[in-house]
């Protein structure tokens, strides 16, 4: 049914082709022209860079001090062993950081299934080869650290963020946390009734087995939707800065002149001139005060000294005096 020319077509899931447990193809149509690439590229970038997962981050191998070495009885050099450990597909429940152990002796391959772990850990690819022992008396023992993270974090980036006193023999591994091994999308032509200018989005995805391909796409779409939520209700969500209101006058100016503890003679002279607050007093000049009956130079000097001890002086100019609180009194 033809809708309004301004109404966008809403895509629906057409088909999910499960090629294998780790490989699937998802087809979505119809999409308005151009939206195939818009959505496909956004989902592709999220699937490659932002999917959480678990990866080997550190390894300690008995008898090995650094990665640029070899171990007697082991066919591969240590760099190749570390590279093989990067291919370990691990699922960890309820934990973000676990340690696994591997002890193997005797001639033959050392595989992921030889790793010892607890019930919270699942090795998805137990047949994955880590190295080969070439002698009946050869053995290898290692402690493997697996952490949860997102995207790809090279060992060099983590080395700078960790303590410089990292023990000799603790080897850092480039961590590829993403469970997505490969993602590709293709945009094909689609048709709805008489419209032939529509898009069909085909996403082909492979994972390492720790996450179902369909679930991976679902999570990527959720991440994208959550990031776009801020644009749906577009407004400045920053908290406004609360400016501290400064009092219009120094609180000391609002205090009565009695708080100055002047002599009785000086205090009575000020009251006779209706000078009740310190703010009233500081606005008077020396000449004005000397005109006050019974207030001589001795009292004037006393008043000046008391005001100076409080950082005040005579002849001050106070705009908007008296404040409303005093005027009401």
From Swiss-Prot:
Instruction: Output the SUPFAM superfamilies linked to this UniProt entry.
Output: C-terminal domain of RNA polymerase alpha subunit, Insert subdomain of RNA polymerase alpha subunit, RBP11-like subunits of RNA polymerase
GO biological process per UniProt: DNA-templated transcription
What are the annotated GO cellular component locations?
cytoplasm; DNA-directed RNA polymerase complex
Task: For the region Alpha C-terminal domain (alpha-CTD), give the residue spans.
Answer: 249-329
Signal peptide residues on this chain, from the entry's feature table = none
InterPro entries assigned to the protein according to its UniProt record, in alphabetical order: DNA-dir_RNA_pol_insert (IPR011262), DNA-dir_RNA_pol_RpoA/D/Rpb3 (IPR011263), DNA-dir_RpoA (IPR011773), RBP11-like (IPR036603), RNAP_asu_C (IPR011260), RNApol_insert_sf (IPR036643)
User: Which Gene Ontology terms cover its molecular function?
Assistant: DNA binding; DNA-directed RNA polymerase activity; protein dimerization activity
- Identify the EC number(s): 2.7.7.6
Question: Which reaction is the catalytic activity of this chain?
Answer: RNA(n) + a ribonucleoside 5'-triphosphate = RNA(n+1) + diphosphate
Domain of life the protein comes from: Bacteria
Which Pfam families does this entry report, sorted A to Z?
Answer: RNA_pol_A_bac (PF01000), RNA_pol_A_CTD (PF03118), RNA_pol_L (PF01193)
Going by the UniProt record, its keywords in alphabetical order are:
DNA-directed RNA polymerase, Nucleotidyltransferase, Transcription, Transferase
Gene3D superfamilies on file: 5' to 3' exonuclease, C-terminal subdomain, DNA-directed RNA polymerase, insert domain, RNA polymerase, RBP11-like subunit
Region: Alpha N-terminal domain (alpha-NTD), residue numbers: 1-235
Q: What family does the database annotate?
A: Belongs to the RNA polymerase alpha chain family.
**Which HAMAP family did the record assign?**
RNApol_bact_RpoA (MF_00059)
Functionally, this protein is described as follows:
DNA-dependent RNA polymerase catalyzes the transcription of DNA into RNA using the four ribonucleoside triphosphates as substrates.
This protein is called: DNA-directed RNA polymerase subunit alpha
Which source organism does the UniProt entry give?
Actinobacillus succinogenes (strain ATCC 55618 / DSM 22257 / CCUG 43843 / 130Z)
């Amino acid at each position: 049914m033809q809708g309004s020319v301004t109404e966008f077509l809403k895509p629906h899931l057409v088909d999910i082709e499960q090629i294998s447990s780790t490989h699937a193809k998802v087809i979505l149509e119809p999409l308005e022209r151009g939206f195939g690439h818009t959505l496909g590229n956004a989902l592709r970038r999220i699937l490659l860079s932002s999917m959480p997962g678990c990866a080997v981050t550190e390894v300690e191998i008995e008898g090995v001090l650094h990665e640029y070495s070899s171990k007697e009885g082991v066919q591969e050099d240590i760099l190749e062993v570390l590279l093989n450990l990067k291919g370990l597909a691990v699922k960890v429940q309820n934990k973000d950081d676990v340690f696994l152990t591997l002890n193997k002796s005797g001639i033959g391959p050392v595989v992921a299934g030889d790793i010892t772990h607890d019930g919270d850990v699942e090795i998805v690819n137990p047949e994955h080869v880590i190295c080969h022992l070439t002698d009946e008396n050869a053995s290898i023992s290692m402690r493997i650290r697996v952490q949860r993270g997102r995207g790809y974090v090279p060992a060099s980036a983590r080395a700078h963020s960790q303590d410089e006193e990292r023990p000799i023999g603790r080897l850092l591994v480039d961590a590829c946390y993403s469970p997505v091994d490969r993602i590709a999308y293709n945009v094909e032509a689609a048709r709805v009734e008489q419209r032939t200018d529509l898009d069909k989005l085909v996403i082909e995805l492979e994972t390492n087995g720790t996450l179902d391909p369909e679930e991976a796409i679902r999570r990527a779409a959720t991440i994208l939707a959550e990031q776009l939520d801020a644009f749906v209700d577009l407004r400045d969500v920053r908290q406004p800065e609360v400016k501290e209101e400064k009092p219009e006058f120094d609180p000391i100016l609002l205090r009565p002149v009695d708080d100055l503890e002047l002599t009785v003679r000086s205090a009575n002279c000020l009251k006779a001139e209706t000078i009740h607050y310190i703010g009233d007093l500081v606005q008077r000049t020396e000449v004005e005060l000397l005109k006050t009956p019974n207030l001589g130079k001795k009292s004037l000097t006393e008043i000046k000294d008391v005001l100076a001890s409080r950082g005040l002086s005579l002849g001050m100019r106070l705009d908007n005096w008296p404040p409303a609180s005093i005027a009401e009194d």
